[in-house]
Amino acid sequence: MAAMAGGLGTLLYAGAARLDFFRVGDGVEVEGNQRITRAEVLMMSGVDVRTNIIAFDTIQAAAAIEKHPWVSRARVYRDLPNRLRIKIEERKPIALLSRDDGLYYVDRAGAVFAQAGGGDDLDYPLITGIKNEGRAAAGLLDRALAMISTIRRNDPIFPRQSLSELHVDRDGEQTLYLVNTPFPLRLGHSRPRQGDIAAVLKQLYRRKVIGITRSVDMEYGRDRVLVRLKTPLV
């Protein structure tokens, strides 16, 4: 009896997989996509107007969609009798990484996932100095992203939009450049808190020397900051 039931189930599946009743036609809903287009999702999933929803491999389709550089996760659901629902979760860049061949988007997890092209949004902090790939470069990138995450926490004097560039030297030292301050802030190998940087900037504004500041060294000494000025104070 069990063998007969199994055989009957196979026959029913095979029959349903050929019925026009289960063809999706244009009944495909795509959700969550902004960067990747609907047409790209459909093409990568392999679904078309002749696709039978019973025979369609939803797991394979999701895996195919996830090969797109901007897609972090894809899920495909059947809505019987003849509709498919595709949910997309796209990567969210937090920085741009400068390489010899161009700029690349980087997400919070440190994945370098897509090259920026003409017309793309470039309003992200720029990470420079990390030229190579591999474990060492990944470690430098992780430290840079941790610093950016710290800086991007809002502060009245230090808004998240203020970060322009974070340069990483070969030995891992970091130098920060802000949008409204033309001088570099050397962070060195340390990871100063956002409040530490903001406190230094507040002092420069309060003493009205922000305009003549040449550089700031946040790692000059233990609990000491070195501020170099373009002109000496009178």
Language model features with spans:
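Charged, solvent-exposed interaction patches on well-folded alpha/beta domains
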Residues: M1-G27, A39, M43-N52, I59-A63, ...
